Each structure stands twice: as structure tokens, then as C-alpha cells.
Regions:
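Iron-associated oxidoreductase/ferritin-like identity signal
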Residues: 1-95
Length: 95
């Protein structure tokens, strides 16, 4: 995955930037895992296995949520956007 690497020399990056990179890459991986589990559930014929896969998928959602909150607490602009756009009935595309 190209997102795992750095675009600038690592020795020029602060600890905060490297930690944010770790969190963003981890969030991407968790969301990718949710997608993979959704596909497996959709293709699976065994109902018991579907339940297990759904449980695993939902744990990935928990992990993604924790990472998103960690990012929100450390990135003020991201925090502002999330607070304005999440958990309301306003149009998503509003400016």
C-alpha cells in the first residue's frame, strides 16, 4: 500500500507528524478490513459463518472509530469539520 510510506525524509518529520501518519494509515487499514468483511459476508453461504464475520467486521468499525477520535482530538480543523458535519440531518454537501 503506497500510503504506508512517507513522502518526505522521515528525519525531517516531527514525532507528531509521524504519529498522525500512523493513525491515518491505521484508519485506512481498518476501513479496508470493514470492506473486506462486507464482501465476505455477502459471498458467504453459511449463516453461522456470516454471524462470525459480521462480528469481526463490527470490531473493525470500533477500531476505526477510536482512531478517528484520536485524530479529531489532535487536528483542530478536522475536529471542526467533524463537529459541523456529523450526527445531524443537515445536507452533507453544505458549504
Amino acid at each position: 500500500m503506497s500510503s504506508v510510506g512517507y513522502h518526505e525524509p522521515i528525519e525531517e518529520l516531527s514525532d507528531e507528524t509521524r504519529d498522525m501518519h500512523r493513525a491515518i494509515v491505521s484508519l485506512m487499514e481498518e476501513l479496508e478490513a470493514v470492506d473486506w468483511y462486507n464482501q465476505r459476508i455477502n459471498a458467504c453461504k453459511d449463516e453461522q459463518l456470516k454471524v462470525i464475520l459480521a462480528h469481526n467486521r463490527d470490531e473493525e468499525k470500533e477500531h476505526a472509530s477510536m482512531l478517528l477520535e484520536w485524530i479529531r482530538r489532535r487536528a483542530s480543523t478536522f475536529s471542526k469539520e467533524l463537529k459541523e458535519r456529523l450526527f445531524n440531518e443537515n445536507p452533507i454537501e453544505r458549504e
